[in-house]
């Protein structure tokens, strides 16, 4: 088990995070660029010295500044996998995988045998084991990098955006393979990604980092069903409103007021699916609650649907069909009315 309490200060970031990862578990770290995800991995490896806290792996203290304990990076039982692979271009696949074992003192014959066996587990056999990275596809290079990270049987496996450099078709196959590998692993696994699909498909738990601090944690279902930051809401694809509830009335921070079906009191978060936002060029007839106007600020194609950002009070995004874009002339901008049924609004505590 990994027990990490990481406190460090850089010129651009102060990182203060604490989490645990059980053996065989996959913890997915998400967050916007510069939030501290990769910095967390570098701290676990030992490349960035802690200012406070401690890192303990299977009962062994890897770092504790208060006790003046710091195990060097090369002595830590950690496997690493990066988005750009970092394979040696002059070595074959089997030589790349065997390198870590040789560096730890394993004899050449045994290292090659273990490297060959690990590559075979990942579907690379025969002539491919003798190929150099330049003669391999992106997916094949990723399998070599995966084998290199696994062959030393690390107690902690760190994966930094491992699928980011792959094309869509290759990514699907490698994601499936990586999921199988991680499910068989006895290591504690930490995955850094900006891709929600990777986090949901591979992670047992998710930790969302913002500005060096943990802003949300839970299972993928818990995090995605109740986002607590604009970042997560954008990943999931829902509108997130924050404000103060008085019964079924929510005073939205930044301006605006909406009516909800569920009553609440005090600080509250509310989500609205863009598909639940109706739009029109004219004010809808009747006196339905949750109807307001705003200026169109963005029109973005998302697959076979279109997202329309309305800069009103509150600001909100609607999802419409391409035909609605033409019928309402949304590309021309201008004023647009938004309507949301109270029953389409989910409220929960922050």
Task: Give the residues covered by each predicted segment.
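ABC ATPase NBD Q-loop/coupling interface
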Residues: 54-76, 107
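Helix-to-loop junction immediately C-terminal to a conserved catalytic motif
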Residues: 45
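ABC ATPase nucleotide-binding domains
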Residues: 77, 92-231
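The feature captures the beta-strand-to-loop junction immediately N-terminal to the Walker
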Residues: 30-32
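Conserved hydrophobic segment flanking the Walker A/P-loop of ABC-type ATPase nucleotide-binding domains
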Residues: 19-23
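ABC nucleotide-binding domain signature
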Residues: 28, 70-72, 76-86, 98, ...
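Glycine/charge-rich catalytic "coupling/switch" loops of P-loop NTPases
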Residues: 253-300, 322-350
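ABC ATPase nucleotide-binding domain helices that frame the ATP-binding cleft
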Residues: 38-41, 144
């Amino acid at each position: 088990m990994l027990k990490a309490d990481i406190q460090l200060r850089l010129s651009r970031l102060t990182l203060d995070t604490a989490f645990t990862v059980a053996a065989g578990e996959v913890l997915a770290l998400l967050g916007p660029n510069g939030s501290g995800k990769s910095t967390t991995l570098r701290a676990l490896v030992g490349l960035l010295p802690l200012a406070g806290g401690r890192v303990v792996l299977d009962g062994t203290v890897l770092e504790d500044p208060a006790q003046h304990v710091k195990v060097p990076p090369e002595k830590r039982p950690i496997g690493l996998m990066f988005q750009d692979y970092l394979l040696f271009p002059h070595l074959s696949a089997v030589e790349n995988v065997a390198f870590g074992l040789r560096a730890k003192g394993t004899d050449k014959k045994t290292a090659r045998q273990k490297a060959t066996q690990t590559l075979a587990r990942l579907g690379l056999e025969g002539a491919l084991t003798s190929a150099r990275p330049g003669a391999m596809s992106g997916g094949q290079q990723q399998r070599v990098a995966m084998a290199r990270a696994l062959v030393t049987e690390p107690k902690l496996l760190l994966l930094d955006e491992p699928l980011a450099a792959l094309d869509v078709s290759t990514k699907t196959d490698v994601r499936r393979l990586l999921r199988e590998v991680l499910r068989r692993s006895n290591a504690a696994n930490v995955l850094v990604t900006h891709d929600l699909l990777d986090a949901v498909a591979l992670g047992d738990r998710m930790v969302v980092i913002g500005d060096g601090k943990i802003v949300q944690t839970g299972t993928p279902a818990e995090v995605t069903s109740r986002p607590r930051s604009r970042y997560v809401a954008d990943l999931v694809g829902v509108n997130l409103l924050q404000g103060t509830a008085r019964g079924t009335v929510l005073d939205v921070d930044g301006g605006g007021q909406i009516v909800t079906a569920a009553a609440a009191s005090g600080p509250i978060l509310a989500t609205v699916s863009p598909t639940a936002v109706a739009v029109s060029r004219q004010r809808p007839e009747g006196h339905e609650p949750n109807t307001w106007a705003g200026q169109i600020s963005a029109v973005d194609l998302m697959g076979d649907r279109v997202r329309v950002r309305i800069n009103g009070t509150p600001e909100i995004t609607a999802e419409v069909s391409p035909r609605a874009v033409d019928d309402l002339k949304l590309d021309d901008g201008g004023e647009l009315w938004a309507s949301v049924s109270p029953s389409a609004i989910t409220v929960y505590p922050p």
